Design a protein with these regions (language model features):
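Interfacial catalytic loop of ABC nucleotide-binding domains
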Residues: 14-16, 114
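Conserved ABC ATPase signature
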Residues: 16-20, 24
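Catalytic Walker B motif of ABC-type/P-loop ATPase nucleotide-binding domains
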Residues: 41-45
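A short, proline-enriched helix->beta-strand linker immediately N-terminal to the Walker B motif
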Residues: 35-39
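Conserved ABC ATPase "signature" region
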Residues: 1-12, 64
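Helical segment within the ABC ATPase nucleotide-binding domain
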Residues: 55-70
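Hydrophobic anchor residue at the start of the ABC signature
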Residues: 30
Length: 137
């Protein structure tokens, strides 16, 4: 019950998955993954199906969850801000065949509020470097 509360799911313990919002279904998936106790999380476009507002909220939620329960995460995403906000280290890949064209460090420390982080000058600078690397790919 305490995990449901921590994951923002209190009161929905017996709710069928089809009745949960997209963000809630994502939190259930992360809860299952964290309960498994694996030291490595592999996340492939975890927020791609969510609307922009829910995606930002879920990114902030995941950052806080990983701060509370640190794990190594391999995150695959096409969203540059998402990669930089959620990661300590970002590898920018070229088109097929994939090769590393740049390695960037995410902003540390991250503000608990995602919007406060992605508007900071250091974040904007890193984002511009990532976009430039993608363009040059």
């Amino acid at each position: 019950a305490e995990l449901f509360e921590r994951f923002g799911l209190a009161g929905f313990e017996r709710t069928p998955p089809a009745e949960l919002s997209g963000g809630m279904r994502q939190r259930v998936a992360f809860l299952r993954t964290l309960i498994a106790g694996k030291p490595l999380l592999a996340l492939d476009e975890p927020f791609a199906a969510l609307d922009a507002i829910t995606r930002g909220e879920m990114q902030g939620w995941l950052a806080a969850a990983l701060e509370a329960d640190p794990r190594t995460v391999v995150l695959v995403t096409h969203d540059v801000e998402e990669a930089l906000y959620l990661s300590d280290r970002v590898l920018v890949l070229s088109p097929r065949p994939a090769g590393v064209v740049a390695e960037l460090r995410g902003p540390v420390p991250r503000a608990p509020d995602r919007d406060a982080t992605v508007t900071r000058p250091d974040f904007v600078s890193i984002r511009e470097r990532a976009l430039q690397a993608l363009r040059q790919g």
